[in-house]
């Protein structure tokens, strides 16, 4: 029963697209209108609404992935197969939100949040950020999905 509650919490939090709503409510900016990908994500919040909206969106997107996983990790058995669903729920909620008629984002920031909730120690977080920045700015990998797969793969091998 507790697993179900954490899965539901994660999916509902994931379905709340902070990177879409923060720019829209505070800056009257629809971040999905101008960019060609029409993605309601943090990168578009930064580009369309500015630094403050982007940073606030990033923090909220990270927390919505981290909070349910962190809390569940303290209460539930991490070794259970159901714990994988707890971790996946915020990501699926973001990718297929019922609040937005299933028009979600790529779930990159919320995936980072899930990892932060699972590994709250500082080293893994810096490692993940380093890989993502490396493949975003230095050795640019496109598309975003390929960059994310490589980042998460290297993260898994090195942490």
Could you describe each region identified by the protein language model?
Residues 1-9, 67-85, 116-126:
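Helix-coil boundary and interhelical linker segments in multi-pass alpha-helical membrane proteins
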Residues 2-27:
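N-terminal signal-anchor transmembrane alpha helix
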Residues 15-21, 103-111, 126:
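Transmembrane helix boundary and interhelical junction motifs in multipass membrane proteins
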Residues 19-24, 91-102, 134-145:
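C-terminal ends of transmembrane helices
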Residues 21-52, 104:
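Cytosolic, membrane-interface loops and tails of multi-pass inner-membrane proteins
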Residues 31-39, 99-112, 143-154:
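Short, non-helical or kinked segments that cap or interrupt transmembrane helices
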Residues 41, 47-73:
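Multi-pass membrane catalytic core of lipid/isoprenoid biosynthesis enzymes
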Residues 49, 72-75, 89, 93, ...:
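Interfacial segments of multi-pass membrane proteins
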